Each structure stands twice: as structure tokens, then as C-alpha cells.
């Protein structure tokens, strides 16, 4: 038995990660600063090289935020509007299809479809958006509708979750973003997003999606009113789901963008975490998930390009999407822009010392640069 957690070596961390992931106690020690952070980051990088190699992937995609009107009032969200706000909007299904076609013509392989919960929406509206996308851009991958939106669709349709997901899949839904997870801690959720679905509901919807052959991502939004213990509990739950279903394609840590978030502006949350903690969260995710969730994404929109490059040397192997509009982070106060050209993201990866690879949503290689 070790006298001190800091006695764990880089090789031990790497071996544990590759063999299935470090235990939660070691992960918590790392996030609480009880382990040398540089040792943790080095181990995460070496584990990443063993698990997925030195390529850094990205997807050419377009975000389509089809409405900013929402019945929920999440206290971190600066994107939502009331129906009578002057800048409230809702796209028609035809407009959504046109944006998908524009994205395809610009070289995108994916559209990411998410929006607020509009009080006048119907389930048919959600189906029609999928129909229009597949009509106007039949080959594009539709990565859409978070578990919160799926729950809302079930309410609108008066159907159970499984039937709704089957209908969405038939209409063209290819995969789902694992957003709306935020932080699973019930105490934090009550303060952060009291209107949002509970963690058990999120897990239930995700598990059914995986059973139906709809792969999803998984996420964690951190740095607001949470703690490292909350982060580990969150990741532990995700690991349990992945052990059962294998349906997660990637884990995306989402650093809290505080500037315009209502909870921060009212003095109820801290302004995110330090850059070092951002990098450590990605490193610990790599070591904790090991080969179980092989892809750890660094969100350049949330972190900024330079910090995202740092995470590539600390466990992350993916930079996400080129985006072509990303309204939610922008409204929250993110300053890194709404899109990158593929050539820009390729250069960012090369500058960090890696081989860029364009991928599909499901991590199939499209082009090695």
C-alpha cells in the first residue's frame, strides 16, 4: 500500500488506463491536486497514444440551432428566449433542410440539430425537420436531439420514449448528442437546471437509444457550482452505461462559459475553472475511461484554440467540429468564434504536432492530411 497517492508512477497510471481505466479514487486524487498534474498529463498522453495513436480527428459539420425559444429556464443558458422577445426565432423544417444542403455543398458530412423546447412545437415538427434534411441532403449524417428534446417529443406525442426514438430513427435520425447531461448531481441540478430532465431520465433515454442502434456522445459541463467529487460521480455513471451498452462514441468535457450565464451574472456561480484544471479534466477522463470510451474531445469553442491544443498533449484526441455557426456558446459569452474552416483546423492540429484526420460522426476516417 502506498503511503501517499503521489507515489503512483506515470507507468502505473498508463498501465491502469490501458487495462480498463484508473479507479475513481485515483481519478479524484488527480483532480484534487493530490497527484503531480504534469505526471497525470504525461500519463494521459501516453495512454492516448497506446489506445488511439497520434492522429487528431475532426468532423466537418454544421450546427443548426433551430429555435432559441424554450419553456425551460436553465440558469446557465444565455441562449434561450421567450416567444415574445424581439430576437426570438424558430426555423421552418424547409429552412432547416436548406441549411443542411448548404452544409453538404460546403463539404460537411454532418449536421448537428438542437434547439430550445418551443411551446408551440409538435412532434410532427421534429419529424419534418428530419424529413427535410434527408430530402435535401440525403447523404448527410443527422446528429440530433438531446435526451431533453427526446423527452419533450414523447410528451408532445403522448408516446413512450422507445416509440418516439423508433419514429425519429425512421425519419432519419442517425445519432444523438449526449448533451443535457450537465452534471448528474441532484443537488447541483436543482440549482443549475431545475426544469431539465433528471439524471435517471437522461440515462434511461440514452440506454434505449443504444438498444435501438442509435449511438450517442456523452458530455459533462463543469466549472460552475460543482466539485471534483461531482465530476468523478458523473464520469462513473457514464462508464457504467458504456460497460453495458458500448453506445458512446466520445466523451466531451464542456468547460462552463460564464460571461453571460444568468447564474454567474447573479453571483451564483464561479467563472469557470483554471486552464490547468481544464487540461486536467481531459487528462483524467482519458485515464479513467481508458479504452472503454476511446475518443476524448476537446471543445475548441469552449476552451479556445490554444488551450484545446494543450489538451491534445494531455489525453484528448479529437477537436470536434468545424461547426459553421454555434449560437449557444456564443450567447453564453464564448469568444472563439462560430466556425473554423477545415484548413484552419488542420493547421491547428499540425501546429500542436499531430497528424490531422477528417472523420465521420462515427469516427470513420475520411481524409488523412
From Swiss-Prot:
* Pathway in which this enzyme or protein is active: Cofactor biosynthesis; coenzyme F0 biosynthesis
Q: Which organism is it from?
A: Methanopyrus kandleri (strain AV19 / DSM 6324 / JCM 9639 / NBRC 100938)
What is this protein's record name? 5-amino-6-(D-ribitylamino)uracil--L-tyrosine 4-hydroxyphenyl transferase
Name any cofactors this protein relies on: [4Fe-4S] cluster
Gene3D superfamilies recorded:
Aldolase class I
How, per the record, is the cofactor bound?
Answer: Binds 1 [4Fe-4S] cluster. The cluster is coordinated with 3 cysteines and an exchangeable S-adenosyl-L-methionine.
Which ranges carry the Radical SAM core domain? Answer: 56-292
Record GO terms (molecular function): 4 iron, 4 sulfur cluster binding; 5-amino-6-(D-ribitylamino)uracil--L-tyrosine 4-hydroxyphenyl transferase activity; 7,8-didemethyl-8-hydroxy-5-deazariboflavin synthase activity; iron ion binding
Sequence similarity: Belongs to the radical SAM superfamily. CofH family.
Amino acid at each position: 500500500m502506498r503511503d501517499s497517492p503521489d507515489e503512483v508512477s506515470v507507468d502505473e497510471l498508463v498501465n491502469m488506463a490501458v487495462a480498463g481505466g484508473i479507479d475513481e479514487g485515483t481519478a479524484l486524487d488527480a483532480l484534487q491536486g493530490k497527484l503531480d498534474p504534469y505526471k497525470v498529463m504525461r500519463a494521459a498522453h501516453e495512454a492516448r497514444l497506446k489506445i488511439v495513436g497520434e492522429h487528431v480527428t475532426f468532423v466537418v459539420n454544421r450546427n443548426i440551432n433551430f429555435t432559441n425559444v424554450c419553456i425551460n429556464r436553465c440558469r446557465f443558458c444565455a441562449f434561450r428566449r421567450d416567444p415574445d422577445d424581439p430576437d426570438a426565432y424558430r426555423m421552418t423544417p424547409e429552412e432547416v433542410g436548406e441549411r443542411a444542403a448548404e452544409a453538404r455543398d460546403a463539404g460537411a458530412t454532418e449536421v448537428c440539430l438542437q434547439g430550445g423546447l418551443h411551446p408551440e412545437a409538435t412532434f410532427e415538427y421534429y419529424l419534418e425537420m428530419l424529413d427535410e434534411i434527408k430530402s435535401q441532403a440525403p447523404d448527410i449524417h443527422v446528429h440530433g436531439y438531446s435526451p431533453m428534446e427526446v423527452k419533450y417529443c414523447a410528451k408532445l406525442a403522448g408516446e413512450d420514449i422507445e416509440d418516439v426514438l423508433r419514429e425519429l430513427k425512421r425519419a432519419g435520425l442517425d445519432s444523438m448528442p449526449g448533451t443535457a447531461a450537465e452534471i448528474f448531481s441532484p443537488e447541483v441540478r436543482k440549482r443549475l437546471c431545475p426544469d431539465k430532465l433528471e439524471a435517471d431520465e437522461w440515462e434511461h433515454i440514452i440506454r434505449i437509444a443504444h438498444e435501438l442502434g442509435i449511438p450517442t456522445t456523452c458530455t459533462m459541463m463543469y466549472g460552475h457550482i460543482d466539485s471534483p467529487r461531482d465530476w468523478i460521480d458523473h464520469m462513473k455513471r457514464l462508464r457504467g452505461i458504456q460497460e453495458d451498452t458500448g453506445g458512446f462514441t466520445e466523451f466531451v468535457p464542456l468547460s462552463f462559459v460564464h460571461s453571460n450565464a444568468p447564474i454567474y451574472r447573479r453571483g451564483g456561480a464561479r467563472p469557470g475553472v483554471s486552464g490547468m484544471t481544464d487540461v486536467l479534466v481531459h487528462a483524467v477522463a482519458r485515464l479513467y475511461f481508458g479504452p472503454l470510451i476511446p475518443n476524448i474531445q476537446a471543445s475548441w469553442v469552449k476552451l479556445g484554440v490554444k488551450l484545446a491544443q494543450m489538451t491534445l498533449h494531455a489525453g484528448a484526441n479529437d477537436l470536434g467540429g468545424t461547426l459553421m455557426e454555434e449560437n449557444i456558446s456564443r450567447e453564453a459569452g464564448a469568444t472563439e468564434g462560430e466556425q473554423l474552416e477545415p484548413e484552419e483546423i488542420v493547421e491547428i492540429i499540425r501546429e500542436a504536432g499531430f497528424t490531422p484526420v477528417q472523420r465521420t460522426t462515427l469516427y470513420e476516417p475520411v481524409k488523412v492530411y
